[in-house]
Amino acid sequence: MTPRSCRFTRALCVCLVLGGVTSTAVAQPGARDGEWRHYGGDEANTRYSPLDQITADNFSDLELVWRMKTDNFGPVPEYNFQSTPLMVGGVVYSTVGTRRSVVAVDAGTGEYLWMHRLDEGERADEAPRRLSGRGLAYRDNGGSGQIIYVT
């Protein structure tokens, strides 16, 4: 192969690779239907939502609809909240408190639907991560979804 044909082949490969990357990025739609089922929004972890109701023009008109207070789950000044809430089927799921309780909250009203707290016993007292809660995931197993969390 001559140096000229080598350069042409390299340039062609670069164009094909860049073209593939660009088309892949454009093809990813992001989180669907206003839901946030995964840590990164969707299965591809794009952290993108295609929702367009909030714009620069109407941003200043936004009002607080509801607020989720978690102080009744054990206020601790050094608590480190690192959870990414999930939104599935009109319900927001999040970890709360120092024992990583999981709550389900109605996305429209802010009403608590349920709370689950696993009794970790002595293990929790010695755990280096006892003051943080993250690790929620959603699994769609063909009809009935599951909320999974790491304890």
Regions found by a protein language model. Name each.
Residues M1-R4, T70-N72, D119, R139-N141:
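Short regulatory "switch" loops immediately downstream of catalytic or recognition motifs
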Residues A11-S23:
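Bacterial N-terminal signal peptides
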Residues R4-R7, A44, L131, L136:
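Short alpha-helical segments used as structural interaction elements across diverse proteins
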Residues D33-G40, E78-S101, A127-T151:
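Repeat-blade elements of multi-bladed beta-propeller folds
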Residues A27-Q28, V102:
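Short beta-strand segments and strand-loop junctions that repeat across beta-rich extracellular domains
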Residues D106-T109:
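Short loop/turn segments that connect beta-strands within beta-propeller blades
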Residues M1-C13:
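Bacterial N-terminal signal peptides that target proteins for export
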Residues Q28-P75, E111-D125:
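Aromatic (tryptophan-biased) beta-strands that constitute blades/sheets of beta-rich domains
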